[in-house]
Each structure stands twice: as C-alpha cells, then as structure tokens.
C-alpha cells in the first residue's frame, strides 16, 4: 500500500490531504503559510524551531505568535518556492510518515516555474535530515479543483449525485494571491479557457484590513496577520479584542463585487454558454450563502478542493503502475 501526500502550498495557507493507495484518507489539515525568523541560543532549546538553509525559523501558527517584524509573508513567488520545502517538511512531521508520492500544484499564472518548483520539493534538507522523493507530480491549481468537483460535486466526502457529468460551467479557484479560472464543457476541462491571474485573491481583502488597522490603531501588521483577523472577525492588541466583523463584512462585499465583475469582463463569452459558475478555494467561503442560482460553492471543505483533487490524481498514478 502506497502513501500519498497531496499538498496545496498556497500563499495564505498550506492545505494537506494524506492517505493511501487503497483510497483511505488518514489526515486532513492546514496551517498558515508564514514563517518567523529567529536566532539561536545555546541555553534555550525550543523543539518548534527548524533549521533551514543556515537559518532558524518558526513555521505556521507558531510563527504568528511573534512580532510582525519577525514574520516573512509568503506573498511573492520567490518566497513561495524558497520556503516550499520547509512547508513540505512541516506537513510530513505533523503526519509522522514519509510519503511515497507527493502531488502539489501551482497557479496557471506561475506554471512557467513548474520545473524549478518540482525540483525544490524533490530534494531538500531541513534540521539535518535529507529528503529525496522520486515520485513528485505538479498540477495546475484549477485542475485539482476540477477533479474534486467531478467526483464529489459540492459535498466532499460524499460522492456527487446532482451533476450529470455533461455540465458546462466556469470554475474559479480563489486563493490568497491568485485566482485560477477554467472552463468545463460536457464535463471535460477545455484548453479554451484556463487562466491564472495574480494579485486578485483574498490578499486584496487582507490588504484592506491591514490598511484599516494602520489607520484606526496605528499598527502595522503583516498580510497573514490580517488574514487571521479576517478569519476570526476581531483584532487583538495587548490583550484586548476589537470586533471588526462589520468592517470585514463591508470589505468582503466590495471584493466579491469586484471579483464577479472581473470574471464577467474577461470571460463573458464563456459564461454565455455555461450552466453555472463553481467557486472553490478559501475565497469561495464568502459566497457560500449567495442567493444567485448560477453560483455554486462547496458545502464545506472550501479550501481543500485542490488538495483533494491532487490526492485523487495520486491514486490514479499508482493504479497505472
């Protein structure tokens, strides 16, 4: 029985699905795509610290406990590829097993760097441990979502019942930095429309929240700290929680209007012959209560649709061997 690590290394969070070639999923979890740089002290031993490329880091939620100036936001591709091995390492340590196969993805907007990204996670060293993986596969982000939609529709882990398999729809995967848009005709992904757009993801909401906090509280926070405010609905400063839910609601509404306008302006011809628009990714959670009958979103597991698809792809690779 082979072990499959499906890992969606996003700019906002790292989503993980881990399972076996018998179709059993063992782990499903996520952690924030952020690191904090720290120094070393021979008298202080902290097991949370990881050594990577001659520097010491805290990763994910451990990093978010540190001051903003210690954080490195993963908002640019150069940081994503640099720290990708560290995120893979963190996932492996949380799982407690070494996978036989790794399946991950990149936005269509960045697929020109796919070889370099694949090589980065094929072989690396963290905490004096060497990792080498022979079976590493890289898919476009939207492709992962599409595989999941085909199998589960809107209701993972329940097998889909409502789609005929011959639907025409526009799929939109909303990430932290990028959005990936793809066209499905008669149940199959079409090369006619498969596009990734940078700097149009949930990061735009985080930027607005960061700007509000700077203006209102005179505090500079990182985009990942702003994402935490977005997720929780409040800003915590020196032990006091400030309710920002109404501010966040307004920012979300503006973003969603801009997003739908972007899709309409760029892909109106494809929309004309589509039955609906399927939104996935973390950003789709903001539209799950939409009254628009033409918009569909997952009932749950919004952020995991790419990672689930990556796992399903990994299953097919072992079945073919």
Task: Give residue spans per PLM region.
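A cytosolic small-molecule/anion-sensing beta-strand core signal
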Residues: 185
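Long, charge-rich alpha-helical interaction segments
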Residues: 207-215
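Nucleotide/phosphate-binding catalytic cleft detector across ATP-hydrolyzing
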Residues: 1-169, 188-202, 216, 224-321
């Amino acid at each position: 029985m082979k072990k499959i690590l499906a890992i969606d290394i996003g700019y906002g969070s790292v989503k993980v699905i881990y399972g076996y070639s018998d179709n059993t999923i063992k782990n499903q979890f996520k952690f924030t795509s952020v690191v904090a740089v720290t120094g070393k002290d021979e008298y202080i031993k902290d097991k949370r610290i990881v050594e990577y490329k001659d520097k010491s880091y805290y990763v994910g939620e451990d990093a978010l406990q540190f001051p903003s100036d210690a954080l490195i936001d993963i908002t640019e591709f150069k940081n994503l590829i640099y720290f990708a091995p560290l995120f893979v390492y963190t996932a492996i340590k949380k799982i407690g097993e070494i996978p036989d196969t790794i399946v991950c993805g990149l936005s269509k907007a960045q697929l020109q760097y796919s070889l370099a990204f694949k090589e980065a996670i094929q072989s690396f060293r963290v905490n004096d441990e060497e990792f080498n993986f022979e079976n590493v596969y890289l898919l476009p982000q939207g492709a992962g979502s599409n595989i999941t939609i085909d199998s589960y529709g809107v209701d993972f882990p329940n097998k889909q019942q409502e789609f005929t398999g011959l639907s025409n729809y526009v799929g939109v995967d909303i990430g932290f930095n990028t959005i990936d848009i793809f066209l499905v005709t008669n149940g199959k992904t079409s090369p006619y429309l498969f596009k990734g757009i940078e700097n149009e993801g949930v990061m735009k909401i985080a930027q607005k929240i960061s700007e509000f906090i700077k203006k209102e509280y005179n505090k500079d926070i990182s985009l990942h700290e702003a994402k935490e405010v977005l997720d929780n609905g409040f800003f915590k400063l020196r032990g006091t929680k400030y309710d920002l839910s109404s501010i966040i609601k307004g920012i979300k509404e503006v973003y969603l209007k801009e997003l739908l306008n972007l899709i309409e302006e760029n892909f109106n011809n494809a929309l004309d012959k589509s039955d609906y628009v399927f939104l996935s990714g973390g950003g789709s959670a903001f539209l799950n209560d939409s009254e628009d009958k033409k918009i569909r979103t997952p009932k749950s597991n919004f952020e995991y649709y790419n990672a689930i698809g990556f796992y399903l792809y990994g299953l097919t690779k072992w079945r073919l061997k």
